Amino acid sequence: MAAEIHSRPQSSRPVLLSKIEGHQDAVTAALLIPKEDGVITASEDRTIRVWLKRDSGQYWPSIYHTMASPCSAMAYHHDSRRIFVGQDNGAVMEFHVSEDFNKMNFIKTYPAHQNRVSAIIFSLATEWVISTGHDKCVSWMCTRSGNMLGRHFFTSWASCLQYDFDTQYAFVGDYSGQITLLKLEQNTCSVITTLKGHEGSVACLWWDPIQRLLFSGASDNSIIMWDIGGRKGRTLLLQGHHDKVQSLCYLQLTRQLVSCSSDGGIAVWNMDVSREEAPQWLESDSCQKCEQPFFWNIKQMWDTKTLGLRQHHCRKCGQAVCGKCSSKRSSYPVMGFEFQVRVCDSCYDSIKDEDRTSLATFHEGKHNISHMSMDIARGLMVTCGTDRIVKIWDMTPVVGCSLATGFSPH
């Protein structure tokens, strides 16, 4: 069912510890059980499985439960050993797991959505199960009564969710590329603000309640850090993935962001450096360097008897420039550009070699990652995806041993 991998330790890359195989369809969620050698998985094959590591080093299913509908999302609350599973039919089901993780009892079904559930969060303090779905809404239900408390609709599929337990703020990402910040109440909610920055659907969110930072990953292959706590609208762009960003995890202790994309890319971003905001793109009717007209500026084209040019933008200064004045390419990691992007000639000349030093490390997960989660205390990561495989990684070589020991170098 599962192979134990003995990789030769590499000082600079994640170490693959185990590979779990056995699901008959895509694995939509995999969660590490804290303080246990165990993983909980949910799959499109309609099963929830709890895998425990045996003496042989292999993971075997101690619980194998078949659902009525494909499993699309999952949340696990370790202190109360409660599992919440969202399904393709819109229902959320609650289970309680025994102390030895060998038995799972059904508790109740929540009629949360009319369509596929995309994300679930359980709040013990309020006894709410909060979820988003492809019926374009976020709902919150009482786990004591099983009743629907409230629901808020969006204009497109709600795809991901984060929740601040202290303030009862919910962050919901959707397929239009928008993130909505809501204040949830017992039977109502209010929209605080909407965040717009992505050019593709938002696939994942991560909220850090300590620094009050929100991270979002999207199908435009980019990550945005929203400084909610700073109250100045500061955003940082991180571009280094070559495919849709599927999962995020911020390590508060070491100020690192771990991200995974659907092509198997695993990135670790150093957020403990002074980064710069990417500029807003400026609009102009002519090149802001050589003043040649752009192709829609018919008057200047006629007056100067010249052909109009295509408009481009320098990623460093944001100016509208022609192709001739922006012929060079450069990475600029301090602004989040880990690979080469278009810059104008004057900005290219201003970028020093040390400015091109990468502020992230990139690794290969070697499978199509659709979901990732971490046990930050142990420096472990689990990835799963459309190839039906679950992989368990030791991330301490790339994020530092300080995680495992609780020691921060800062």
Swiss-Prot record:
Q: Name one GO molecular function term.
A: 1-phosphatidylinositol binding
Can you cite an annotated GO cellular component?
Answer: cell junction
Indicate where this protein resides in the cell.
Early endosome
Q: Which domain of life is it from?
A: Eukaryota
Q: Spell out the residue ranges that the record assigns to WD repeats.
A: 22-61, 66-105, 112-150, 153-192, 197-236, 240-279, 364-403
Q: Principal localization?
A: other
Q: Which Pfam families match?
A: FYVE, WD40
Q: Which UniProt keywords apply?
A: Endosome, Metal-binding, Phosphoprotein, Repeat, WD repeat, Zinc, Zinc-finger
Summary of the function given for this chain in its UniProt record: Positively regulates TLR3- and TLR4-mediated signaling pathways by bridging the interaction between TLR3 or TLR4 and TICAM1. Promotes TLR3/4 ligand-induced activation of transcription factors IRF3 and NF-kappa-B, as well as the production of IFN-beta and inflammatory cytokines.
Q: What is known of its domains?
A: The FYVE-type zinc finger domain mediates interactions with phosphatidylinositol 3-phosphate in membranes of early endosomes and penetrates bilayers. The FYVE domain insertion into PtdIns(3)P-enriched membranes is substantially increased in acidic conditions. The FYVE domain is required for its function in regulating TLR3 signaling.
- Designated name of the protein: WD repeat and FYVE domain-containing protein 1
The organism named in the record is Homo sapiens
